[in-house]
Amino acid sequence: LNDLVRPIVEAAEHDPNVAGVLLKGSQSMGAADEESDWDVVVVLLEGEPSQKRDGRVELITTTLERVRGVSSWELPALAHSRVLLDKTGELAVAVEAAGRLTREELAELYDNYLNDFYRSLKAWRRGRELGARILSGRSLWWLGDLLMGLEGTRAPYTEYWAGRLGDLEPLIVEVARTADPRKQQELQAAVEQIATAHGFRDVYDGWNGDIDRVMTFRFE
């Protein structure tokens, strides 16, 4: 353990009200740089949440009940946390559960991606560049969550996506840079194959030919 974190874990080991300790953020994911802090979460059996900074350590105190019922926007952080201490075994269970997506969640991500792809291409066709670019960018948010979810894990926050998007990553980066509708069509065709292979053809078919139609659009 880092010298900044070790004393926190050692103190937690001897505190009967502490269920465990988590490390969150870039330090837990091997993505730290010289500006990265140490985000340490001390999980209590009982008590009030708190947060304080001590140099490069952000010390967060929460309860086991709150970890079990974490809000949806915090799930990526919990899913990619590192368990430093787990007296009851419940933290490991919570981290694992946070990383799982249901079929319903994955289907919704795919549908959201298709929706923004469809609307972006229609906007390009009508000469509405700003809307087309914004929709293209948002489509990639859904897509990243989908691709990592199909591989069995909840996506981390977007700043940690590099190197996690598989063979499609170069094309995704190109679409992120340009919002080029032709590149969007190329990407969607590849995504369609992946999603179909994972059993989500029903989502595509639910568009009743609308995606097929915008795939025939030609852009100069």
Which residues are covered by each model-predicted region?
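Short aromatic-enriched loop/helix-cap "lid" or pocket-rim segments at secondary-structure transitions
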Residues: 33-35, 71, 159-161
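Catalytic metal-binding acidic patch
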Residues: 23-65
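Conserved nucleotidyltransferase catalytic core and NTase-mimicking acidic/glycine-rich helix/loop elements
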Residues: 99-220
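Helical scaffold of the NTase/Pol beta-like nucleotidyltransferase catalytic core
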Residues: 1-21
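Conserved NTP/Mg2+-binding pocket subregion across the NTase superfamily
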Residues: 3, 48-131, 219-220
